[in-house]
A protein has these predicted regions:
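Glycine-rich flexible loops
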Residues: 1-170
Length: 170
């Protein structure tokens, strides 16, 4: 599906209570996660839910926004990305180390949020950003604000003189 013109059939609706029950599990394989998500679909003919469905569901806020902002990624992908994020955002966000998307990432994000319930969002290092709130507007405005902070930081940075030289194997 193209997110620029996605229609309702491309947005698989799930039973949130069924998905949230998965939070109690210690382990869940990718195959079992997909099966559980498909079992929670309101319409069995819908496409598979996103690999990040659990992550959204495990955060308790009413509205959860998530993006892979170029600006945030440009900051977090630095060797000292976690330090830069702490400098930029202070206590407004909590940082989550990189973990492949799926059950383990969802569990990690939920644990990080539980330790920091007053944050406006989560920065997932080398992945993206989540913001949340009790209204869609609050979650959205937090997203715009936090991404803008990263954009301003990048605008102040001096560009690198060159990238490391690489070659394809022969």
């Amino acid at each position: 599906w193209d997110m620029g013109n996605i229609e309702p059939p491309g947005l698989p609706a799930v039973r949130l209570d069924a998905i949230r029950k998965l939070r109690k599990l210690k382990k869940l394989s990718d195959e079992d996660m997909v099966n559980a998500q498909r079992g929670a679909l309101l319409d069995s003919g819908s496409p598979n839910p996103s690999v990040e469905t659990l992550l959204h569901a495990f955060l308790p806020q009413k509205f959860v926004d998530h993006t892979h902002s170029d600006a945030v990624l440009a900051v977090t992908d630095q060797p000292d990305g976690d330090s830069i994020c702490r400098e930029l955002y202070g206590d407004r966000v909590a940082l989550v180390p990189y973990i492949m998307p799926g059950f383990d990432l969802a569990q990690s994000c939920a644990r990080v949020w539980e330790k920091n319930p007053d944050v406006e969002g989560l920065i997932l290092l080398k992945h993206g950003i989540f913001t949340f709130g009790e209204t869609a507007r609050i979650a959205y405005e937090r997203m715009i604000d936090l991404v803008t902070i990263a954009e301003k930081r990048l605008a102040q940075s001096k560009p690198s003189k060159s990238f490391a030289s690489i070659r394809l194997p022969r």
